[in-house]
Amino acid sequence: MGETLAQKIICAHLLHGDMTPGSEIALRIDQTLTQDATGTMAYLEFETMGIPRVRTELSVAYVDHNTLQSGFENADDHRYLQTVAKKHGVWFSRPGNGICHQVQLERFGKPGRTLIGSDSHTPTGGGIGMLAFGAGGMDVAVAMGGGAYYITMPKMFKVNLTGTLRPYVTAKDISLELLRILSVKGGVGAIIEWGGPGIAALSVPERATITNMGTELGATTSIFPSDDVTRAFLAAEGREADFIPLASDPDAQYDRVIDIDLNTLQPMIACPHSPDNVVPVETLAGTKVDQVCIGSCTNSSLFDMLKVAALLKGRTIAPGVSLSISPGSKQVLTMLADCGALTDILASGARLLECACGPCIGMGFSPNSGGVSLRTFNRNFLGRSGTKDAQVYLVSPETAVAAALTGTITDPQTLGPMPAVTLPEHFRIDDSAVLPPAPADEADAVEVLRGPNIQPFPQSRPFADTLTAELVLKVGDNITTDHIMPAGAKILPYRSNIPKLSEFCFTVCDPTFPARARAAGDGIIVGGSNYGQGSSREHAALVPMYLGIRCVVAKSFARIHAANLINAGILPLTFENPADYDALQPGARLRIDGIRAGMAAGKLTLTDTAAGKAYSVVCSLTERQQAILLAGGLLNYTKEHAL
């Protein structure tokens, strides 16, 4: 039996384990990336390991999230990242150089390599044929130190594309259509491979849009073959030597195959407040729009921006609409300026923002109260934009432009003929904003600079054999890491300061949570299905750990968050009978006995001591994960088992 493309790359990087779906495997990692919102903690963790220099082929530290610098905290973090990167063998992408996934794709991504990043949209690299995973910062720190990256061997899904996209129908619409089919939970435990005759007409930026939004499906990662399209992109970036052809075997077997006919696809839109709440754009035509944002790691490539400029040329945005443009990288912005496209964008009335994440994470450009905002982003969770009552929709750049021009949600196919847009054969190459690390023989002399907001990494506690704790919070289904640890301009500056950050934990759900969790001493959280979906931010585990949370019991967990809980020393458990969720109420005193033996057996008993009721919970942990929890988290475990 033949192998899928993902199986081939996994096999080439397999250090331990059996490639049977559901079993734990350990992978050798070639490249890592961090961004500044999660990177400061990742490098603090790396420093505690005492390893002088990274052991990957390539590691890059990006600054693209906390770029407002409204106080000293962001600037101090950037200075810390620049100096710690220089000292330990990491390349540093300066603020303004671009969004990590866009720059990584342009300048560093290589087909067939493995990549993990402390950002959940790291699978963007699958657009160039990489096996790329989002992960918590602790896992990235271990990989930088030469350690393996552990995952559960995924199932293999295949999406076959046939036909050709019609004008105004885009890669974003393909992503939204798959979300409509599968939901935000439909890709959990799977790698999604894209193939079929329809992929031949998709450029690397379009493919990267699709693999980027595989994260919203809950997929482990997504990947395209490396083919002539890939070669052309690498050649345009002056990196054709990095090209290798990669494809699945003709007789490869998949656990599920999904067919999408591009000929019948139409412009799609994800309605508030979930990326899978998808309908055709035409069904919402006429809805008033207040704001349009074009950019993010999903839709900020040169190809996207050239299409936006072509549609805006000679036109003016509607008086009641505010339009922002965030190019994905300095390369994109410079080339837009070179060809005159930037002038067309600005002449339309658009506002040019920095080459950064910006509005996607609530870092500026928040909508008006109750406003309707159309965004080319990948998430529209409640409050993520920075405005709690805003209605955020996810669309393609073409649909975004149509709304900006008309002032209402509009099917872009009504705009007339789509202007022809082609990518140049060669892109402008300027890597001056990517700073190299110090040579190994000069690294000792580099001083790592730390501002007063950068606090030491919090210490977790090993597990005793019995846990007695208060149920301090009960939440529902699809709780995101934005619910657990909000982002935005007011909170992100404290990502290096866990004590300060803890003041905001779960306040979206319950403003009293931080104080009650501290008062409880040891605490337990109960959640519904898909607990912890969304961003890979490990702060959504580290901060609850700091507040005394020892265990989370849920109907099911998102993959990255479950790993982050274990890394932080928090025990993730699932209900054997999901109906037991309804019986547990906040304030209950809960006890778990025989933790060590129960971990090994895969089942524990959760007892409500006042009610005298016992509930069976499942403990799906590998031996390694059990050892991590018993040690009090991954850093303690790593120190005990030197890399």
Question: Residues of each region from the PLM?
Answer:
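Fe-S-dependent hydro-lyases/dehydratases of central metabolism
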Residues: M1-L643
